[in-house]
């Protein structure tokens, strides 16, 4: 089980990312556009740098939905490998069965 503070911090980051997502996309579009003047590009870069660090989506960590485990995360299930294995053995994941060949 991950620390509750780490799980809460990650949730807070998700909210910040969502809040700034639209403006970040606009600024990045200005920066990447080859027709943008150098002054506008530099101004957009400065504004992007002034945003909070947690506004960047790369700072959000994928965590197990059940207990917040940060490693061994499987996107398909939204759970860690440990939790997927436990639930699969108990038959709680529809369509998942033990492999045999």
From Swiss-Prot:
Part of the 30S ribosomal subunit. Contacts proteins S3 and S10. The lineage of its organism: Bacteria, Bacillati, Actinomycetota, Actinomycetes, Mycobacteriales. Gene3D superfamilies: 1.10.287.1480. Belongs to the universal ribosomal protein uS14 family. InterPro entries: Ribosomal_uS14 (IPR001209), Ribosomal_uS14_bac/plastid (IPR023036). This is Small ribosomal subunit protein uS14. One of its GO terms (cellular component) is small ribosomal subunit. Keywords: Ribonucleoprotein, Ribosomal protein, RNA-binding, rRNA-binding. Binds 16S rRNA, required for the assembly of 30S particles and may also be responsible for determining the conformation of the 16S rRNA at the A site. GO terms for molecular function: rRNA binding; structural constituent of ribosome. GO terms for biological process: translation.
